[in-house]
Amino acid sequence: MKRAHPDYSSSDSELDETVEVEKESADENGNLSSALGSMSPTTSSQILARKRRRGIIEKRRRDRINNSLSELRRLVPSAFEKQGSAKLEKAEILQMTVDHLKMLHTAGGKGYFDAHALAMDYRSLGFRECLAEVARYLSIIEGLDASDPLRVRLVSHLNNYASQREAASGAHAGLGHLPWGSAFGHHPHVAHPLLLPQSGHGNTGTSASPTDPHHQGRLAAAHPEAPALRAPPSGGLGPVLPVVTSASKLSPPLLSSVASLSAFPFSFGSFHLLSPNALSPSAPTQAANLGKPYRPWGTEIGAF
């Protein structure tokens, strides 16, 4: 009699293996039809039901494997970087996962569980993706070939910047949790030296560091017309955005992740500010006089 709720006990597996052995022996002797014909209709229906059940189990097993590989492709940074350009094989995903785990083990087991290290890893990957998109835009939309001076300067600058940021993040990896602004290589409340307003007077060309408070004060006095574009003074940090979450909607693992992320508040000073020279109306006039299309980002690249 057929059971209403079939189980997947060891007896079923043994019976399935016995049936497979009988089929193989029948194939070898050429007596497959006679072997099946000797069974009763009840036994034949049970064999077909078990085969159908085995196919369902095999399909579920393959689905679990594919879902796990998809999660690994999303979680492992090296696999996540390559998934947009080419299709990864299962062996490649597993190899990247093994390499990533070895790297974490070498780093002391802190790398992937460190919120700052995780954010820096994906920030580096995102910057590389943006760099590739800029190169595609220059070649496809702007029509600039690989030997164009503007394209060479821009791509070279972005490559150098990415390499410097990766080297800086690697140097700070052993210092524990750092504020988000340290990922940019300068203090969050101080603007980038290349984006500070340049003065033509000789008193601002001294040997003072761009991050020196007195140097910042002289620059502020030399350019009083752009108060909104200057960063806050070095005595205090800029406005901070706290991470706001609802504890009642998060599971315990997510709560621990949010707690670790709350140690790194975002600061408006971390984002690079534009120089007032970049907003001056003389840039379009100069570009028009040269007979070239106006590219405001092209005029700024020459300073690097």
Swiss-Prot record:
Q: Where are the transmembrane segments?
A: none
Q: Which cysteines are joined by disulfide bonds?
A: none
Task: Give the matching InterPro entries.
Answer: bHLH_dom, HES_HEY, HLH_DNA-bd_sf, Orange_dom
Q: Which residues form a coiled coil?
A: none
Q: Where is the composition biased (Polar residues)?
A: 28-47, 200-210
* Cellular-component GO terms for this entry: nucleus
Regions of compositional bias (Low complexity) in chain numbering? 218-234
Cite the entry's keywords alphabetically: Developmental protein, DNA-binding, Notch signaling pathway, Nucleus, Repressor, Transcription, Transcription regulation
Concerning Pfam families, the annotation shows: Hairy_orange (PF07527), HLH (PF00010)
Q: Does the keyword Repressor belong to this entry?
A: yes
Q: Where is the bHLH domain?
A: 49-104
Secretion signal span? none
- Name a GO molecular-function annotation: RNA polymerase II-specific DNA-binding transcription factor binding
Q: Where is this region: Disordered?
A: 1-52, 191-234
Q: Which domain of life is it from?
A: Eukaryota
Quaternary assembly: Self-associates. Interacts with HES1 and HEYL. Interacts with HDAC1, NCOR1 and SIN3A. Interacts with GATA4 and GATA6. Interacts with CCDC89/BOIP.
Give the family from UniProt: Belongs to the HEY family.
Q: What is this protein called?
A: Hairy/enhancer-of-split related with YRPW motif protein 1
Organism lineage reads as: Eukaryota, Metazoa, Chordata, Craniata, Vertebrata
